[in-house]
Amino acid sequence: MKGIIRAGMAALAAVALLGGGAARADKPLTLGVSVGLGNVAMEIAVREARAQGLDVKLVEFSDYISQNEGVNDGSLDANYYQHLPYLESMIAAKGYKLVPVALGYTSRMAIYSKKHRALAELPDGAAIAYPNDPVNTGHALLILQEAGLITLKPDVGTKATLRDVTANPRKLRFRELEGSIVARALDDVDAAVIYPGFVAVAGVKPESALYAEKDSSRYAIRWVTR
């Protein structure tokens, strides 16, 4: 956590200099974050920043869209919740004038369950939930393949969709949900592919994953401003 706090303070300073906060020194720097366990470290970083003279206000969101909208329209100075592939996809889709200014923590997307303690316990026909945005859909399907549950077309990468599934020997049933509600669906599905910070809010221990991706370096969370 200390590393996150130090990185957070450095990034807050960078956002203040490079982002909208530099132009409105009489107002607090407004930072959009997603509701989740990781905000504990962010709240500490904000307190430390305030002690050093930088006024920061955290604004929590429960969805994936509003934070980028807020930074783009100027109601937020920055946000801290997304990895680079997701940011790039939103810029392409929405035309946002957003830029990543600092690297945050790396969070491994993983398979979680409230009903089963191991992948081997998943029954045939198990219901699996994951985020429905294109980038995280592809990411989730790659993790399901890495875990040995499905097979995808060769070299499909993060653009994978259900149409790219070539083998599903356990006849898994897939539920594509808005990203912020996937964790809450854990009571209704056999497992979900989601980030640790979101499952913590749903009362699941982040370390209890049935399977976590092996390499998550490309999916480090970024500080984003305009």
Residue ranges and their predicted role:
Residues 89-101, 115-116, 188, 193, ...:
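Ligand-binding "clamshell"
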